[in-house]
Amino acid sequence: MIYRLSEYDENRAIGYYQIPVLKPCYYVPEQIIGFNYVKSWRKARDGIGVHFFLDDYQFERMWITPHRQIERLKDFSCVFTPDFSLFLDMPRAMKIWNVYRSRLIGQIMQDVGLKVIPTLSWGEEETFEFCFEGLEPGGVFTVSTRGVVRNKKAQGIWKTGMDFAIEKLKPKCILCYGVRIDYDFRDTEVKYFDARKCN
């Protein structure tokens, strides 16, 4: 088990679960690609962001060797925080652990000068007490709609969580990865990225 305790700073963590805090980011990328394409990407990197809306095994190395992976990310205009899974059937302890890991990696990336956009992810309502911890209001956030639109239960959970996120975080802009969803984002600016074109 890798804990990354040498990277953790209790003075930059918040709440009962001591989740690392991220500074807000106001950058909006023109295009995004998956982390799994970073190593082979040969095109221009200006205006390009890197997302982690992938199976966890494809970016677990961000936790195992973060500094080595960050070297490959430095030339991109921004990076999203890792989207570690928060499946409904996972024990709560694992969900908290995955939120902690995502924030800590985001903090490490910010410390070396990367523009970091927090990824919003949540499960059932009981997860709201920790899923949005460590995020300061007013910046740009990203979220995925994959697997949500065609599943009524998942769509309900997504909308409830997004309601909570907008109320708590008051985003300047939300970057949505996936298909458009029937949801009122109110006064929040929204930019969609088609998952089929984010390679």
Where in this protein do the model-derived segments appear?
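Eukaryote-skewed repeat-based solenoidal scaffolds used as protein-protein interaction platforms
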Residues: 39-45, 49, 54, 62-199
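C-terminal accessory extensions appended to soluble enzyme cores
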Residues: 1-25, 187-199
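N-terminal accessory interaction module
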Residues: 24-41
